[in-house]
Amino acid sequence: MDDIFTQCREGNAVAVRLWLDNTENDLNQGDDHGFSPLHWACREGRSAVVEMLIMRGARINVMNRGDDTPLHLAASHGHRDIVQKLLQYKADINAVNEHGNVPLHYACFWGQDQVAEDLVANGALVSICNKYGEMPVDKAKAPLRELLRERAEKMGQNLNRIPYKDTFWKGTTRTRPRNGTLNKHSGIDFKQLNFLTKLNENHSGELWKGRWQGNDIVVKVLKVRDWSTRKSRDFNEECPRLRIFSHPNVLPVLGACQSPPAPHPTLITHWMPYGSLYNVLHEGTNFVVDQSQAVKFALDMARGMAFLHTLEPLIPRHALNSRSVMIDEDMTARISMADVKFSFQCPGRMYAPAWVAPEALQKKPEDTNIRSADMWSFAVLLWELVTREVPFADLSNMEIGMRVALEGLRPTIPPGISPHVCKLMKICMNEDPAKRPKFDMIVPILEKMQDK
């Protein structure tokens, strides 16, 4: 079978769908020139493939090596339907490439008149200069130039030149496609790992920042008492299910080192510069989580969980809380598979009871509806996002577990929060597990809240 980039270029929708259905495939990977599958589908005008990639979570504003976004390519080649689709999904209309050109520069230069009109109607700036001091309208033929100026003026644009700023990108991050080779390795040679800084140590092991094959990674070294052949076999059998590359809101385990030869069983995952949602909310990272960012994080988590809940069988021993949600460089929340517990790791122990549903604290896992219990955990995350507080911060884990399970201890919803969020939280935290919604039911609710 040809590679995914060829399938997207040629518009082979059936092959693309089959490829996307394999959880080990990463739809945001790039080829040698940094083109993602979405770049190729947009360049070649493959509408059905573009739609499919976007619905599966392709990053809209991803940049190739020349800093072109999919919108630059669709505008250059005059694919009006795709330009409109990208704009519908919030593509950055004034994204700047390495030459300082925005998509409108290319639509004007290549004489894509209708596309140029659509871009201006959606807020593309007609007088933004590239590195060479040229505005998009300088690239257009006379009739189009006049038309675009007139349209822009009607929309309230100032037609004075906007000089090129080299500092345009300061304070934002450029979204690059991921290295497409990382999902090809499942067994990793421990000797190839370069351990740089210890990030954390707790009951379950050590967390390190490291390098592997030129990539920043996180290395999780598991502490396991009495390592045996049986535990080694379980580790080998359970690891492959954690390599989920096919959803943008799930952070896969890249690979593992078996012990022996490694001194301890070890997991490798992508480095996330902002750390976990817990770090972002409670440990003073450099950006503010306002209401709209909180809703976006909630939507990311709901989409990731909705996907995980489609897997049969479900991934066991996965605990949803703010320490097991990682924040990517483009502010995307991702459910971490490296935080899933293995069958040999302290069965029956709860290390974050504040996020655990009361029935899951009272019953054995096999007697609990895991999907409903996850929805309770999500409700606590919603509470955490709107209050910026750690749930039950003044109590020990043992007290929290006992009081949530036996005394009806619950997070109190403070006054003054959005009535929509408040209502959603109450629905998700229904005392009757059977009455809690499914994640695929709350995704559209969060999407509406985001649009508002």
Swiss-Prot record:
Motif Nuclear localization signal boundaries: 363-371
Binding site for ATP: 200, 202-204, 270, 272, 279, 341
Any one cellular-component term (Gene Ontology): lamellipodium
Positions of ANK repeats: 2-30, 31-63, 64-96, 97-129, 130-174
Gene3D superfamilies: Ankyrin repeat-containing domain, Phosphorylase Kinase, domain 1, Transferase(Phosphotransferase) domain 1
Sequence ranges assigned to domain Protein kinase in this UniProt record: 193-446
BP term (GO), one: substrate adhesion-dependent cell spreading
Annotated stretches, region: PH-like: 180-212
Residues given in the record as Mg(2+) binding sites: 339
Annotated keywords: Acetylation, ANK repeat, ATP-binding, Cell junction, Cell membrane, Cell projection, Cytoplasm, Cytoskeleton, Magnesium, Membrane, Metal-binding, Nucleotide-binding, Nucleus, Phosphoprotein, Repeat
InterPro entries listed in its UniProt record: Ankyrin_rpt, Ankyrin_rpt-contain_sf, Kinase-like_dom_sf, PK_ILK, Prot_kinase_dom, Ser-Thr/Tyr_kinase_cat_dom, Ser/Thr_Kinases-Pseudokinases
N-acetylmethionine carried by residues: 1
Gene Ontology MF, one: integrin binding
Positions of post-translational N6-acetyllysine modification: 426
Region spans: Interaction with LIMS1: 33-139
Family affiliation: Belongs to the protein kinase superfamily. TKL Ser/Thr protein kinase family.
Protein name from the UniProt record: Scaffold protein ILK
Organism taxonomic ancestry: Eukaryota, Metazoa, Chordata, Craniata, Vertebrata
